[in-house]
């Protein structure tokens, strides 16, 4: 835990909750002592699930709070270097989560800004379709409004005109609404288990959703500007793919 930044801790906690909700078991993990005694050293996925389970960590600001905290602390007279800094700066919740649960499938971290978790879902579907694994645990987390990062990230979003300036939450929280004047900066975590068809049902679990189609592309434009015509055409292409998937069911 000490070697993870705050965002990674949030992501790992969400991931463990998702495993429970998906009915994926964690069984005792053992090792032999020098005397030949078997002792429990943790909990992990059964061997039959380990190699077929991948992990994707989706985050925009993971690890940045650790760096700012360390730089701030270095100004103090009694400063001592934190030997865990590198691991905390990397923000590799995907690797740490896989280590904790023993997931040996494909593993990566992605940053697509506000679309990170959405992109991760598309990547998970691709992995499963290509046969790289049978399931993917997606971890999505950020702590942009924490005491360490908020003054920097908040100022950055305000400078680009991307953050809402409304004083009341009711006036600011208007997703997909013409009255929306920007995003609300916050913190949180989510985790999803995306699986090949039939696996959840085989465990007696009713899936909460089905992925009919995904698409992720880039408009090759400045990151704070939108090519609305290109976005509209890509949404149409995604909907066409989803309609075909529905017809095939």
Which residues are covered by each model-predicted region?
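Conserved active-site "lid/cap" helical segment
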Residues: 1-53, 234-249
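Active-site-proximal gating segment of KS-fold condensing enzymes and close homologs
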Residues: 7, 54-108, 149-165
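Beta-strand segments within the central parallel beta-sheet cores of soluble alpha/beta enzyme folds
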Residues: 29-35, 46-50, 54, 107-112, ...
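Solvent-exposed alpha-helices and their adjacent loops that cap or buttress functional pockets
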Residues: 43-50, 101-103, 128-131, 167-169, ...
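Short acidic, glycine/serine/threonine-rich loops at helix termini
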Residues: 66-70, 121, 147-154, 205, ...
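Phosphate/pyrophosphate-binding betaalpha-module
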Residues: 140-179
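Condensing-enzyme catalytic core mediating Claisen C-C bond formation in acyl metabolism
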Residues: 168-249
